[in-house]
Amino acid sequence: LDVPTMADKPSTEVLYWVGCAASYDDRSKKVARAMVRLLKAANVDFAILGEEESCTGDSARRAGNEYLFATLAEQNVAVLNGYQEQGGIKTIVTACPHCFNTLAHEYGDFGGHYQVVHHADFLLRLLREGKLSPKRAVKGKVVFHDSCYLGRYNDIYESPRDALRDIPGLE
């Protein structure tokens, strides 16, 4: 896919946070690849952390392992803040609701204050700005699953549906 890393382009303003699921789970890898293709189609200047990205620690915290969570959070915050000091990372985009919640709401306690955007919101913005447009109609019905961390914890319900409504032919 030829995706640059922040190490290659440290002043890049949009970081695509891949997350654990998209790194290891075959179905989630498809989401990550599709997201990269969409970001490129919209001419978004973005990068990933690559091997510098660690788990956000969300699952460790939910399992009660605060030590592991803090270790991972401190490590990630050091990396992210380092790139911010070089003029990069104004926005973090992620498809993972758990990563979204952790980066946006829990890393502040470790000195990490970021503008984090769920990929549905980011894609909707690209659609509305005319930077992305569906190339063909897609016939069929679609159901969107509201994950706990996206919906109930972060009140993101409409943007995924609005983005889907912009695709001709979907019900």
List the predicted regions and their residue ranges:
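Iron-sulfur cluster-binding electron-transfer modules in prokaryotic oxidoreductases
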Residues: 1-171
